Amino acid sequence: LSLQSQHFAAEMGISPMTEGQKQSPWWTPERHLDRKPFLQARSAISRALRDWFEDEGFAEVETGILQKSPGNETHLHAPSADLTSASGDKLKYFLRTSPEFACKKLLAAGETKIVEFARVFRDRERGPLHLPEFTMLEWYRANESYEAVMADSVVVIAQAAQTTGIGTFAFRGKVADPFAEPDLLTVADAFTRFAAIDLLATIPHGQADREALAAAATDRVRITDDDTWSDIFSKVLVEHVEPHLGQGRLTILYEYPAPESALARAKPSDPRVAERFEVYACGVELANGFGELIDAGEQRSRFIAAMDEKERRYGERYPLDEDFLAAMTQMPEACGVALGFDRLVMLASGATRIDQVVWTPPPEDGP
């Protein structure tokens, strides 16, 4: 256990987990007792954050888990569910990878400040920071700039730390003060500082120049002939940039390059970058936020391009949510952010793996 975990456990009169207990199922009394302080921290943080969002005037919503389209990002994989209609027709649905589409439909319907503690699902993901089923804390503000949800994210993270009484987040030898003023860093500046790459030179007019980035990164990461601009970008980000983020204090990494804009809108004054940010603590990504794109035609083009690449890579593509694209035409200007609730609880409680902070974690060999 980490020092924070040991301290938390000691306060509860709980002995550290033995190696034998680690291998036992989560439902054994001994292992549950070892995890209980983390689970109590989870409940306390959930209550505190719900109170904060209510005080801020947010409506807590509950959106559906079954979706006709689970999202249209190249490397996200969704579990599927085969249903049968009352008339016997076979229906294909997916478990959502995010509540984003549904929440934005609510913005189109007239909601202005909404939040959801959403159960979401990702196939092909498992590890100290990943589970196939986890909780996404997602919230949206209509008619506000994305700096508003940036500020929210910092407050939410500090609220979690204040709730458990932890003074410093720690993970894999890195520490961060959740109460300190965050470090604001553009993606372009981060690539210059940590990888000596002029990232903006590889996206003239917002268009990805694969060969330019490959040439700039050839001595930094292993590049294959099949790698796209986005693949190379991700390799540099993961290997050379992310390890430096959120050390000592939170880092807000913002102004993502246009090819990585996803559902974010372009920065009005510079089309090479998007109104997208991520928040890091101890090298761990906690939150991902957007100034929301509301151009349905542009979003359709992005989705189709992402699904073309998904089909090339993985031999499958997900359908577009035409209902969502129609709702986009009614959406107000908005901003939103998705925060990994389990990861936040992990850092705020001193746990070392997110399955320690989940009440019923899936077994390593599947549910």
Describe each PLM feature range.
Residues 75, 89, 111, 130-136, ...:
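A generic structural signal for well-ordered coil/turn residues at beta-strand boundaries
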Residues 142-145, 162, 196, 282, ...:
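Short, well-ordered loop/turn and helix-capping segments at boundaries between secondary-structure elements
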Residues 2, 8, 14-148, 156-158, ...:
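Class II aminoacyl-tRNA synthetase-like tRNA-binding/catalytic domains
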